[in-house]
Protein backbone atom coordinates (compact mmCIF):
# COMPACT_ATOMS: atom_id res chain seq x y z
CA UNK A 1 0.00 0.00 0.00
CA UNK A 2 1.45 3.39 -0.96
CA UNK A 3 1.02 6.17 1.57
CA UNK A 4 1.61 9.86 1.07
CA UNK A 5 4.59 11.63 2.65
CA UNK A 6 2.19 13.11 5.21
CA UNK A 7 1.11 9.70 6.41
CA UNK A 8 4.74 8.54 6.71
CA UNK A 9 5.56 11.59 8.79
CA UNK A 10 2.44 11.08 10.90
CA UNK A 11 3.39 7.44 11.46
CA UNK A 12 6.87 8.42 12.69
CA UNK A 13 5.34 10.98 15.05
CA UNK A 14 2.83 8.48 16.39
CA UNK A 15 5.53 5.84 16.90
CA UNK A 16 7.59 8.31 18.87
CA UNK A 17 4.65 9.40 21.00
CA UNK A 18 3.44 5.91 21.80
CA UNK A 19 6.72 4.07 22.31
CA UNK A 20 8.99 6.68 23.83
CA UNK A 21 8.42 8.54 27.05
CA UNK A 22 7.60 12.02 25.84
CA UNK A 23 9.19 14.89 27.73
CA UNK A 24 6.95 17.87 28.31
CA UNK A 25 7.69 20.85 30.50
CA UNK A 26 5.51 22.11 33.31
CA UNK A 27 5.43 25.74 34.34
CA UNK A 28 8.36 25.22 36.74
CA UNK A 29 10.53 23.85 33.93
CA UNK A 30 10.80 20.41 35.48
CA UNK A 31 10.59 17.37 33.25
CA UNK A 32 7.29 15.42 33.23
CA UNK A 33 7.17 11.97 31.60
CA UNK A 34 3.86 10.80 30.12
CA UNK A 35 2.30 8.11 27.94
CA UNK A 36 -1.17 9.77 27.99
CA UNK A 37 -3.01 8.46 24.91
CA UNK A 38 -5.42 11.43 24.98
CA UNK A 39 -2.45 13.73 24.57
CA UNK A 40 -1.38 11.72 21.53
CA UNK A 41 -4.90 11.90 20.05
CA UNK A 42 -5.00 15.66 20.49
CA UNK A 43 -1.96 15.95 18.24
CA UNK A 44 -2.49 13.06 15.86
CA UNK A 45 -6.22 13.10 15.09
CA UNK A 46 -6.47 16.67 13.77
CA UNK A 47 -3.52 16.01 11.47
CA UNK A 48 -5.17 12.90 10.04
CA UNK A 49 -8.62 14.46 9.64
CA UNK A 50 -7.21 17.61 8.01
CA UNK A 51 -5.27 15.51 5.53
CA UNK A 52 -8.29 13.32 4.72
CA UNK A 53 -10.58 16.33 4.29
CA UNK A 54 -8.23 18.05 1.86
CA UNK A 55 -9.55 15.69 -0.80
CA UNK A 56 -13.06 14.53 -1.59
CA UNK A 57 -14.01 11.37 0.28
CA UNK A 58 -15.33 8.67 -2.04
CA UNK A 59 -18.32 6.61 -0.91
CA UNK A 60 -19.03 3.31 -2.65
CA UNK A 61 -22.20 1.42 -1.69
CA UNK A 62 -22.71 -2.08 -3.09
CA UNK A 63 -20.08 -1.45 -5.74
CA UNK A 64 -21.50 1.84 -7.02
CA UNK A 65 -19.95 5.22 -6.31
CA UNK A 66 -22.41 7.55 -4.62
CA UNK A 67 -22.88 11.11 -5.89
CA UNK A 68 -21.83 13.00 -2.76
CA UNK A 69 -20.46 16.55 -2.73
CA UNK A 70 -17.33 17.31 -0.73
CA UNK A 71 -19.27 19.33 1.83
CA UNK A 72 -21.69 16.45 2.42
CA UNK A 73 -19.10 14.18 4.06
CA UNK A 74 -15.92 14.64 6.09
CA UNK A 75 -13.77 13.07 8.82
CA UNK A 76 -14.10 14.60 12.30
CA UNK A 77 -11.35 14.80 14.93
CA UNK A 78 -12.47 11.48 16.40
CA UNK A 79 -11.60 10.00 12.99
CA UNK A 80 -15.24 9.17 12.31
CA UNK A 81 -16.74 9.88 8.89
CA UNK A 82 -19.68 12.25 9.28
CA UNK A 83 -22.27 12.51 6.52
CA UNK A 84 -25.30 14.68 5.80
CA UNK A 85 -28.33 12.72 6.95
CA UNK A 86 -30.08 13.57 3.69
CA UNK A 87 -27.66 11.32 1.79
CA UNK A 88 -28.64 8.16 3.67
CA UNK A 89 -32.24 7.66 2.54
CA UNK A 90 -31.51 6.88 -1.08
CA UNK A 91 -28.11 5.28 -0.72
CA UNK A 92 -28.90 2.95 2.18
CA UNK A 93 -32.57 2.31 1.28
CA UNK A 94 -33.95 3.43 4.62
CA UNK A 95 -36.55 5.76 6.07
CA UNK A 96 -35.02 8.96 7.47
CA UNK A 97 -37.12 11.43 9.45
CA UNK A 98 -36.34 14.51 11.51
CA UNK A 99 -38.67 15.31 14.42
CA UNK A 100 -38.79 18.68 16.20
CA UNK A 101 -35.55 19.72 14.47
CA UNK A 102 -33.45 17.75 16.95
CA UNK A 103 -34.33 14.03 16.78
CA UNK A 104 -33.44 11.80 13.84
CA UNK A 105 -35.02 8.40 13.27
CA UNK A 106 -33.60 5.91 10.74
CA UNK A 107 -35.63 2.77 9.98
CA UNK A 108 -35.06 -0.27 7.81
CA UNK A 109 -37.12 -3.44 8.12
CA UNK A 110 -36.82 -4.35 11.83
CA UNK A 111 -34.01 -1.95 12.80
CA UNK A 112 -34.65 1.49 14.26
CA UNK A 113 -31.87 3.99 15.02
CA UNK A 114 -32.67 7.10 17.07
CA UNK A 115 -30.20 9.97 17.33
CA UNK A 116 -30.43 13.33 19.05
CA UNK A 117 -28.58 16.42 17.87
CA UNK A 118 -25.58 17.27 20.11
CA UNK A 119 -26.02 14.11 22.18
CA UNK A 120 -23.64 11.15 22.35
CA UNK A 121 -26.49 8.85 23.41
CA UNK A 122 -28.25 6.85 20.72
CA UNK A 123 -30.90 4.12 20.73
CA UNK A 124 -30.87 0.99 18.60
CA UNK A 125 -34.29 -0.68 18.81
CA UNK A 126 -34.72 1.18 22.14
CA UNK A 127 -31.39 -0.11 23.53
CA UNK A 128 -29.10 2.72 24.65
CA UNK A 129 -25.56 3.05 23.26
CA UNK A 130 -22.84 5.71 23.52
CA UNK A 131 -21.36 7.45 20.47
CA UNK A 132 -17.80 8.65 19.89
CA UNK A 133 -19.09 11.40 17.63
CA UNK A 134 -22.43 13.03 18.26
CA UNK A 135 -24.73 14.33 15.51
CA UNK A 136 -24.43 18.08 15.05
CA UNK A 137 -25.56 20.97 12.88
CA UNK A 138 -23.19 22.98 10.69
CA UNK A 139 -24.35 25.59 8.17
CA UNK A 140 -27.96 24.40 8.61
CA UNK A 141 -26.99 20.83 7.68
CA UNK A 142 -27.19 17.88 10.08
CA UNK A 143 -24.30 15.42 10.12
CA UNK A 144 -24.36 11.92 11.59
CA UNK A 145 -21.75 9.14 11.98
CA UNK A 146 -21.85 7.08 8.80
CA UNK A 147 -20.32 3.90 10.21
CA UNK A 148 -23.00 3.61 12.89
CA UNK A 149 -25.84 3.68 10.35
CA UNK A 150 -24.07 1.35 7.93
CA UNK A 151 -23.20 -1.29 10.51
CA UNK A 152 -26.61 -1.26 12.22
CA UNK A 153 -28.24 -1.81 8.83
CA UNK A 154 -25.91 -4.80 8.31
CA UNK A 155 -23.40 -3.36 5.86
CA UNK A 156 -19.73 -4.32 5.83
CA UNK A 157 -17.91 -1.02 6.33
CA UNK A 158 -14.32 -0.51 5.17
CA UNK A 159 -12.18 2.65 5.21
CA UNK A 160 -9.26 2.82 2.77
CA UNK A 161 -7.06 5.68 3.96
CA UNK A 162 -4.77 5.52 0.93
CA UNK A 163 -7.66 5.91 -1.53
CA UNK A 164 -9.73 8.22 0.72
CA UNK A 165 -12.58 5.80 0.12
CA UNK A 166 -15.34 4.14 2.13
CA UNK A 167 -16.84 0.90 0.89
CA UNK A 168 -20.16 -0.34 2.27
CA UNK A 169 -21.50 -3.73 1.21
CA UNK A 170 -25.00 -4.86 2.12
CA UNK A 171 -25.04 -8.26 3.82
CA UNK A 172 -28.84 -8.44 3.72
CA UNK A 173 -29.72 -7.91 0.07
CA UNK A 174 -32.24 -10.74 0.21
CA UNK A 175 -34.08 -9.20 3.16
CA UNK A 176 -36.98 -6.80 2.62
CA UNK A 177 -36.46 -3.10 3.24
CA UNK A 178 -39.91 -2.51 4.68
CA UNK A 179 -41.88 -4.16 7.51
CA UNK A 180 -45.09 -6.16 7.01
CA UNK A 181 -47.24 -3.18 7.94
CA UNK A 182 -46.66 0.56 8.06
CA UNK A 183 -48.94 3.56 8.50
CA UNK A 184 -47.79 7.16 8.05
CA UNK A 185 -50.39 8.18 10.63
CA UNK A 186 -48.40 6.32 13.29
CA UNK A 187 -45.22 8.31 12.62
CA UNK A 188 -46.71 11.79 12.10
CA UNK A 189 -46.09 11.74 8.34
CA UNK A 190 -49.66 12.01 7.01
CA UNK A 191 -51.07 15.38 6.03
CA UNK A 192 -54.46 16.85 6.80
CA UNK A 193 -57.49 15.22 5.13
CA UNK A 194 -59.14 17.63 2.66
CA UNK A 195 -62.38 17.83 0.71
CA UNK A 196 -62.44 18.44 -3.05
CA UNK A 197 -66.18 19.02 -3.06
CA UNK A 198 -67.98 18.64 -6.38
CA UNK A 199 -65.02 19.56 -8.63
CA UNK A 200 -62.90 17.11 -10.62
CA UNK A 201 -59.73 18.06 -8.80
CA UNK A 202 -58.79 14.80 -7.10
CA UNK A 203 -55.53 14.76 -9.10
CA UNK A 204 -54.46 18.10 -7.61
CA UNK A 205 -55.49 17.11 -4.09
CA UNK A 206 -53.65 13.79 -4.36
CA UNK A 207 -50.50 15.40 -5.71
CA UNK A 208 -50.31 18.08 -3.02
CA UNK A 209 -51.29 15.66 -0.25
CA UNK A 210 -48.38 13.47 -1.33
CA UNK A 211 -46.02 16.46 -1.32
CA UNK A 212 -47.19 17.58 2.12
CA UNK A 213 -46.58 14.06 3.37
CA UNK A 214 -43.09 14.01 1.83
CA UNK A 215 -42.18 17.17 3.75
CA UNK A 216 -43.37 15.78 7.08
CA UNK A 217 -42.37 15.56 9.88
CA UNK A 218 -39.80 18.31 9.26
CA UNK A 219 -42.24 20.80 7.73
CA UNK A 220 -46.01 21.00 8.02
CA UNK A 221 -47.48 22.86 5.06
CA UNK A 222 -50.96 23.20 3.59
CA UNK A 223 -50.75 23.71 -0.16
CA UNK A 224 -53.35 25.02 -2.60
CA UNK A 225 -55.17 22.65 -5.02
CA UNK A 226 -57.03 25.71 -6.32
CA UNK A 227 -53.81 27.18 -7.68
CA UNK A 228 -52.60 23.91 -9.19
CA UNK A 229 -55.91 23.30 -10.97
CA UNK A 230 -56.38 26.89 -12.18
CA UNK A 231 -52.87 28.26 -12.77
CA UNK A 232 -51.29 25.46 -14.78
CA UNK A 233 -50.54 25.69 -18.52
CA UNK A 234 -53.32 23.35 -19.64
CA UNK A 235 -56.59 24.49 -21.21
CA UNK A 236 -58.93 22.74 -18.82
CA UNK A 237 -61.28 23.70 -16.01
CA UNK A 238 -61.72 22.31 -12.52
CA UNK A 239 -64.61 20.22 -13.82
CA UNK A 240 -62.56 18.53 -16.53
CA UNK A 241 -60.41 16.40 -14.27
CA UNK A 242 -56.70 15.81 -14.70
CA UNK A 243 -53.85 13.43 -14.02
CA UNK A 244 -50.42 13.17 -12.46
CA UNK A 245 -48.59 14.36 -15.61
CA UNK A 246 -50.39 17.70 -15.31
CA UNK A 247 -49.38 17.97 -11.67
CA UNK A 248 -45.78 17.10 -12.51
CA UNK A 249 -45.67 19.72 -15.29
CA UNK A 250 -47.00 22.45 -12.98
CA UNK A 251 -44.60 21.52 -10.17
CA UNK A 252 -41.40 20.97 -12.15
CA UNK A 253 -41.99 24.25 -14.02
CA UNK A 254 -42.04 26.06 -10.65
CA UNK A 255 -45.55 27.38 -11.30
CA UNK A 256 -46.31 26.16 -7.79
CA UNK A 257 -47.06 24.95 -5.21
CA UNK A 258 -48.39 27.88 -3.19
CA UNK A 259 -49.93 28.08 0.26
CA UNK A 260 -53.61 27.28 0.72
CA UNK A 261 -54.06 30.47 2.76
CA UNK A 262 -52.96 32.51 -0.27
CA UNK A 263 -55.37 30.77 -2.66
CA UNK A 264 -58.33 29.28 -0.74
CA UNK A 265 -60.10 26.40 -2.44
CA UNK A 266 -63.50 26.56 -4.09
CA UNK A 267 -64.03 30.29 -4.60
CA UNK A 268 -63.27 30.23 -8.34
CA UNK A 269 -60.60 32.89 -7.88
CA UNK A 270 -56.85 32.35 -8.18
CA UNK A 271 -54.05 34.91 -8.07
CA UNK A 272 -51.73 34.45 -11.10
CA UNK A 273 -48.94 36.43 -9.41
CA UNK A 274 -48.27 33.95 -6.62
CA UNK A 275 -44.90 32.20 -6.76
CA UNK A 276 -43.85 28.72 -5.72
CA UNK A 277 -43.04 28.18 -2.05
CA UNK A 278 -41.13 24.96 -2.81
CA UNK A 279 -39.21 23.71 -5.84
CA UNK A 280 -40.00 20.17 -6.91
CA UNK A 281 -36.86 18.77 -8.53
CA UNK A 282 -37.64 15.07 -8.78
CA UNK A 283 -40.79 13.07 -9.53
CA UNK A 284 -40.48 9.29 -9.71
CA UNK A 285 -43.02 7.17 -11.57
CA UNK A 286 -43.04 3.73 -9.99
CA UNK A 287 -43.43 0.49 -11.97
CA UNK A 288 -46.95 -0.77 -12.58
CA UNK A 289 -48.26 -3.14 -9.88
CA UNK A 290 -44.86 -3.37 -8.21
CA UNK A 291 -46.15 -3.37 -4.66
CA UNK A 292 -42.70 -3.66 -3.05
CA UNK A 293 -41.53 -0.52 -4.85
CA UNK A 294 -44.67 1.32 -3.76
CA UNK A 295 -44.14 0.29 -0.14
CA UNK A 296 -40.49 1.32 -0.26
CA UNK A 297 -41.46 4.72 -1.67
CA UNK A 298 -44.03 5.32 1.09
CA UNK A 299 -41.46 4.25 3.66
CA UNK A 300 -38.68 6.47 2.32
CA UNK A 301 -40.47 9.47 0.80
CA UNK A 302 -44.03 9.63 2.16
CA UNK A 303 -47.39 9.41 0.42
CA UNK A 304 -47.57 7.92 -3.09
CA UNK A 305 -50.15 9.30 -5.52
CA UNK A 306 -52.07 6.48 -7.20
CA UNK A 307 -55.32 5.86 -9.07
CA UNK A 308 -58.31 3.54 -8.88
CA UNK A 309 -61.80 3.13 -10.25
CA UNK A 310 -64.09 4.39 -7.50
CA UNK A 311 -67.69 3.30 -7.99
CA UNK A 312 -68.79 5.59 -5.16
CA UNK A 313 -69.87 9.11 -6.07
CA UNK A 314 -69.88 10.72 -2.62
CA UNK A 315 -68.97 9.95 1.00
CA UNK A 316 -72.52 8.72 1.67
CA UNK A 317 -73.15 6.71 -1.51
CA UNK A 318 -73.19 2.91 -1.57
CA UNK A 319 -71.36 0.39 -3.72
CA UNK A 320 -71.10 -3.38 -3.89
CA UNK A 321 -67.33 -2.92 -3.94
CA UNK A 322 -67.15 -0.95 -0.68
CA UNK A 323 -67.58 -2.38 2.81
CA UNK A 324 -68.58 0.69 4.78
CA UNK A 325 -68.23 -1.01 8.17
CA UNK A 326 -64.60 -1.96 7.57
CA UNK A 327 -63.71 0.98 5.28
CA UNK A 328 -62.59 -1.66 2.76
CA UNK A 329 -62.71 -1.30 -1.05
CA UNK A 330 -61.91 -3.70 -3.89
CA UNK A 331 -62.88 -3.40 -7.56
CA UNK A 332 -62.28 -6.30 -9.96
CA UNK A 333 -64.10 -5.14 -13.10
CA UNK A 334 -62.94 -3.65 -16.40
CA UNK A 335 -63.43 0.07 -15.74
CA UNK A 336 -60.36 2.28 -15.98
CA UNK A 337 -59.22 4.53 -13.11
CA UNK A 338 -61.35 7.61 -12.48
CA UNK A 339 -60.03 8.87 -9.15
CA UNK A 340 -56.68 9.73 -7.56
CA UNK A 341 -55.87 8.97 -3.93
CA UNK A 342 -52.69 8.81 -1.83
CA UNK A 343 -51.23 5.57 -0.49
CA UNK A 344 -50.07 6.29 3.07
CA UNK A 345 -49.32 2.75 4.24
CA UNK A 346 -50.06 -0.94 3.96
CA UNK A 347 -50.92 -4.01 5.99
CA UNK A 348 -49.95 -7.37 4.51
CA UNK A 349 -52.15 -9.10 7.07
CA UNK A 350 -55.29 -7.00 6.60
CA UNK A 351 -58.08 -9.65 6.58
CA UNK A 352 -59.45 -10.56 3.17
CA UNK A 353 -62.79 -11.20 4.90
CA UNK A 354 -63.19 -7.44 5.43
CA UNK A 355 -63.99 -6.97 1.74
CA UNK A 356 -67.31 -7.57 -0.01
CA UNK A 357 -65.97 -10.29 -2.28
CA UNK A 358 -64.02 -13.50 -2.00
CA UNK A 359 -60.29 -12.80 -2.32
CA UNK A 360 -57.32 -15.13 -2.46
CA UNK A 361 -55.19 -13.65 0.30
CA UNK A 362 -54.96 -10.94 2.93
CA UNK A 363 -53.39 -7.55 2.34
CA UNK A 364 -54.35 -3.95 1.60
CA UNK A 365 -52.97 -0.50 0.99
CA UNK A 366 -53.98 2.24 3.43
CA UNK A 367 -55.22 5.15 1.32
CA UNK A 368 -56.11 8.77 2.05
CA UNK A 369 -59.01 10.20 0.07
CA UNK A 370 -60.00 13.81 -0.65
CA UNK A 371 -63.66 13.56 0.37
CA UNK A 372 -63.34 14.96 3.86
CA UNK A 373 -63.28 13.17 7.20
CA UNK A 374 -66.86 11.89 6.85
CA UNK A 375 -65.65 9.27 4.39
CA UNK A 376 -64.04 6.08 5.67
CA UNK A 377 -62.02 6.17 8.86
CA UNK A 378 -61.66 9.97 9.14
CA UNK A 379 -60.89 10.16 5.42
CA UNK A 380 -58.80 6.98 5.20
CA UNK A 381 -59.79 3.58 3.76
CA UNK A 382 -58.28 0.21 2.79
CA UNK A 383 -57.84 -0.91 -0.83
CA UNK A 384 -57.16 -4.59 -1.43
CA UNK A 385 -53.99 -5.69 -3.18
CA UNK A 386 -56.40 -7.47 -5.56
CA UNK A 387 -58.05 -4.26 -6.76
CA UNK A 388 -57.41 -4.21 -10.52
CA UNK A 389 -56.38 -0.54 -10.75
CA UNK A 390 -54.55 0.31 -7.55
CA UNK A 391 -50.80 0.42 -8.14
CA UNK A 392 -50.92 0.90 -11.92
CA UNK A 393 -50.19 4.65 -11.94
CA UNK A 394 -47.91 5.61 -9.03
CA UNK A 395 -46.05 8.85 -8.41
CA UNK A 396 -43.79 9.90 -5.56
CA UNK A 397 -42.32 13.39 -5.13
CA UNK A 398 -38.86 12.40 -4.02
CA UNK A 399 -36.90 15.67 -4.11
CA UNK A 400 -38.53 18.86 -2.86
CA UNK A 401 -36.21 21.77 -2.12
CA UNK A 402 -36.39 25.30 -0.78
CA UNK A 403 -36.77 28.05 -3.35
CA UNK A 404 -33.22 29.33 -2.81
CA UNK A 405 -31.76 26.19 -4.44
CA UNK A 406 -31.45 28.03 -7.76
CA UNK A 407 -32.21 31.57 -8.89
CA UNK A 408 -33.44 30.92 -12.42
CA UNK A 409 -35.09 28.24 -14.52
CA UNK A 410 -34.81 28.14 -18.33
CA UNK A 411 -37.53 26.06 -19.98
CA UNK A 412 -39.91 25.79 -22.92
CA UNK A 413 -42.08 22.85 -21.81
CA UNK A 414 -44.67 24.21 -19.38
CA UNK A 415 -47.02 21.32 -20.19
CA UNK A 416 -44.27 18.80 -19.52
CA UNK A 417 -44.29 15.21 -20.75
CA UNK A 418 -47.16 15.13 -23.27
CA UNK A 419 -45.62 12.73 -25.80
CA UNK A 420 -42.39 11.05 -26.85
CA UNK A 421 -39.96 11.32 -29.74
CA UNK A 422 -37.31 9.01 -31.14
CA UNK A 423 -36.01 7.02 -34.08
CA UNK A 424 -37.54 3.62 -33.45
CA UNK A 425 -34.71 2.59 -31.13
CA UNK A 426 -33.86 2.68 -27.43
CA UNK A 427 -31.43 5.61 -27.57
CA UNK A 428 -31.53 9.20 -28.76
CA UNK A 429 -29.63 12.49 -28.48
CA UNK A 430 -31.42 15.76 -27.81
CA UNK A 431 -30.30 19.29 -26.96
CA UNK A 432 -31.71 22.68 -26.06
CA UNK A 433 -30.00 26.04 -26.57
CA UNK A 434 -30.46 28.94 -24.15
CA UNK A 435 -29.41 32.58 -23.85
CA UNK A 436 -28.30 33.81 -20.43
CA UNK A 437 -30.31 36.75 -19.10
CA UNK A 438 -27.45 37.95 -16.92
CA UNK A 439 -24.13 36.76 -15.51
CA UNK A 440 -24.95 33.34 -14.08
CA UNK A 441 -23.64 29.93 -13.13
CA UNK A 442 -25.24 27.03 -14.98
CA UNK A 443 -25.70 24.60 -12.08
CA UNK A 444 -28.05 21.78 -13.13
CA UNK A 445 -30.37 20.42 -15.79
CA UNK A 446 -33.70 18.61 -15.51
CA UNK A 447 -35.27 16.09 -17.90
CA UNK A 448 -37.47 13.01 -18.03
CA UNK A 449 -36.64 9.34 -18.12
CA UNK A 450 -39.55 7.81 -20.02
CA UNK A 451 -38.94 4.28 -18.79
CA UNK A 452 -37.16 2.19 -16.19
CA UNK A 453 -33.37 1.75 -16.04
CA UNK A 454 -32.63 4.72 -18.27
CA UNK A 455 -28.93 5.44 -18.81
CA UNK A 456 -27.99 9.04 -19.50
CA UNK A 457 -25.04 11.23 -20.42
CA UNK A 458 -25.22 15.01 -20.01
CA UNK A 459 -23.03 17.39 -22.01
CA UNK A 460 -22.43 21.15 -21.92
CA UNK A 461 -21.77 23.29 -25.01
CA UNK A 462 -20.43 26.80 -24.46
CA UNK A 463 -20.68 29.70 -26.94
CA UNK A 464 -23.44 28.00 -28.91
CA UNK A 465 -23.96 29.47 -32.38
CA UNK A 466 -25.82 26.93 -34.52
CA UNK A 467 -26.23 23.20 -35.17
CA UNK A 468 -22.52 22.94 -35.93
CA UNK A 469 -21.86 23.82 -32.29
CA UNK A 470 -23.30 20.43 -31.30
CA UNK A 471 -20.33 18.63 -32.87
CA UNK A 472 -18.27 16.13 -30.91
CA UNK A 473 -15.35 18.51 -30.39
CA UNK A 474 -17.52 21.12 -28.69
CA UNK A 475 -19.17 18.86 -26.12
CA UNK A 476 -17.98 18.63 -22.54
CA UNK A 477 -19.23 15.61 -20.60
CA UNK A 478 -20.74 16.80 -17.32
CA UNK A 479 -22.14 13.62 -15.82
CA UNK A 480 -23.48 10.19 -16.65
CA UNK A 481 -25.60 7.77 -14.68
CA UNK A 482 -28.77 5.71 -14.52
CA UNK A 483 -32.34 6.30 -13.36
CA UNK A 484 -33.99 3.22 -11.91
CA UNK A 485 -37.53 4.52 -12.39
CA UNK A 486 -39.24 6.65 -15.01
CA UNK A 487 -39.86 10.24 -14.00
CA UNK A 488 -38.39 13.74 -13.89
CA UNK A 489 -34.87 14.17 -12.53
CA UNK A 490 -32.51 17.04 -11.79
CA UNK A 491 -28.83 16.38 -12.47
CA UNK A 492 -26.36 18.76 -10.83
CA UNK A 493 -23.08 19.94 -12.31
CA UNK A 494 -20.08 19.02 -10.16
CA UNK A 495 -18.57 22.33 -11.24
CA UNK A 496 -21.01 25.05 -12.42
CA UNK A 497 -20.36 26.76 -15.75
CA UNK A 498 -20.07 30.54 -15.84
CA UNK A 499 -21.99 32.37 -18.57
CA UNK A 500 -22.04 36.07 -19.36
CA UNK A 501 -25.14 38.12 -20.01
CA UNK A 502 -26.36 37.39 -23.54
CA UNK A 503 -24.12 34.35 -23.95
CA UNK A 504 -25.69 31.40 -25.68
CA UNK A 505 -25.07 27.87 -24.42
CA UNK A 506 -26.62 24.43 -24.82
CA UNK A 507 -27.29 21.27 -22.84
CA UNK A 508 -27.15 17.96 -24.67
CA UNK A 509 -28.58 14.69 -23.35
CA UNK A 510 -27.97 11.16 -24.54
CA UNK A 511 -30.43 8.64 -23.12
CA UNK A 512 -30.93 4.93 -23.54
CA UNK A 513 -34.24 3.53 -22.31
CA UNK A 514 -34.62 -0.26 -22.60
CA UNK A 515 -37.54 -1.45 -24.75
CA UNK A 516 -38.38 2.08 -25.88
CA UNK A 517 -38.68 3.30 -29.46
CA UNK A 518 -39.33 6.96 -28.59
CA UNK A 519 -37.29 7.68 -25.44
CA UNK A 520 -37.29 11.52 -25.44
CA UNK A 521 -40.12 13.34 -23.63
CA UNK A 522 -41.70 16.22 -25.54
CA UNK A 523 -44.42 18.84 -25.22
CA UNK A 524 -46.79 19.32 -28.17
CA UNK A 525 -50.40 20.11 -29.08
CA UNK A 526 -51.89 16.65 -28.58
CA UNK A 527 -55.47 17.51 -27.65
CA UNK A 528 -57.70 20.34 -26.50
CA UNK A 529 -56.02 20.61 -23.10
CA UNK A 530 -52.62 21.30 -24.70
CA UNK A 531 -53.79 23.65 -27.44
CA UNK A 532 -51.84 26.57 -25.94
CA UNK A 533 -48.42 24.93 -26.32
CA UNK A 534 -45.98 27.65 -27.44
CA UNK A 535 -43.31 26.58 -29.94
CA UNK A 536 -41.71 30.02 -30.16
CA UNK A 537 -39.99 29.87 -26.78
CA UNK A 538 -37.68 26.92 -27.40
CA UNK A 539 -34.69 25.98 -29.53
CA UNK A 540 -34.39 22.22 -29.47
CA UNK A 541 -32.56 19.68 -31.59
CA UNK A 542 -32.72 15.90 -31.90
CA UNK A 543 -30.35 13.36 -33.42
CA UNK A 544 -30.32 9.64 -34.00
CA UNK A 545 -26.61 9.14 -33.29
CA UNK A 546 -25.40 12.58 -32.23
CA UNK A 547 -24.06 13.61 -35.64
CA UNK A 548 -26.89 14.90 -37.84
CA UNK A 549 -29.34 17.17 -36.04
CA UNK A 550 -32.87 18.42 -36.74
CA UNK A 551 -34.86 21.23 -35.16
CA UNK A 552 -37.75 19.73 -33.20
CA UNK A 553 -39.81 22.91 -33.48
CA UNK A 554 -39.50 22.99 -37.28
CA UNK A 555 -39.67 19.28 -38.12
CA UNK A 556 -41.82 17.86 -35.30
CA UNK A 557 -43.80 20.89 -34.01
CA UNK A 558 -42.82 20.20 -30.42
CA UNK A 559 -40.66 21.34 -27.52
CA UNK A 560 -38.14 19.16 -25.74
CA UNK A 561 -38.63 18.55 -22.04
CA UNK A 562 -35.24 19.84 -20.94
CA UNK A 563 -34.79 22.52 -18.28
CA UNK A 564 -31.72 24.36 -16.99
CA UNK A 565 -31.18 25.83 -13.53
CA UNK A 566 -28.78 28.69 -12.81
CA UNK A 567 -27.57 30.86 -9.96
CA UNK A 568 -26.92 34.57 -10.28
CA UNK A 569 -23.35 35.80 -10.02
CA UNK A 570 -22.81 39.25 -8.43
Identify the residue ranges that each predicted region occupies:
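Catalytic-core signature of thiol
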Residues: 171-443, 448-481, 513, 518-527
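Short, surface-exposed beta-strand/loop patches at domain edges
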Residues: 510-570
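Positively charged n-region of N-terminal signal peptides that target proteins for export
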Residues: 1-6
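Primary recognition of N-terminal secretory signal peptides and signal-anchoring hydrophobic helices
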Residues: 17-180
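Short beta-strand segments enriched for Tyr within beta-sheet-rich domains
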Residues: 445, 503-509
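Short proline/glycine- and polar residue-rich coil/turn motifs
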Residues: 480-487, 499
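Short, surface-exposed tryptophan/glycine-enriched loops
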Residues: 293-298, 489-503
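Hydrophobic helical h-region of N-terminal Sec-dependent signal peptides
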Residues: 9-14, 18
Amino acid sequence: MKYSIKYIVFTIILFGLLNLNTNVFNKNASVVKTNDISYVKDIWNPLISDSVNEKKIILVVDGLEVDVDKQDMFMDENLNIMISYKKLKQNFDCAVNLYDNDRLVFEKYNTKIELEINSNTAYINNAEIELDSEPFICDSEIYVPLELVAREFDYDYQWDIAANKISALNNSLDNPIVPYSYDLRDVARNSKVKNQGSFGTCWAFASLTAIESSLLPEEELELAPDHMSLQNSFSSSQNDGGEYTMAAAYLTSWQGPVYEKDDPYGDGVSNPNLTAVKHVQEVQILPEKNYEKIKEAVYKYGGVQSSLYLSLTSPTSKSVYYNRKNYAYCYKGEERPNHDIVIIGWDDNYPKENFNMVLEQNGAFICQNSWGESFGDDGVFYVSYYDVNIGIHNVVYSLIEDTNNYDNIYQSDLCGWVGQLGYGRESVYFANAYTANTKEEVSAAGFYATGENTDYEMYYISNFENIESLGVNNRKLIKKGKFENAGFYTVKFDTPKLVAEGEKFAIMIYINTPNSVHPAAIEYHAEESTKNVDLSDGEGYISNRGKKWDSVEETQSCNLCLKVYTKNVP
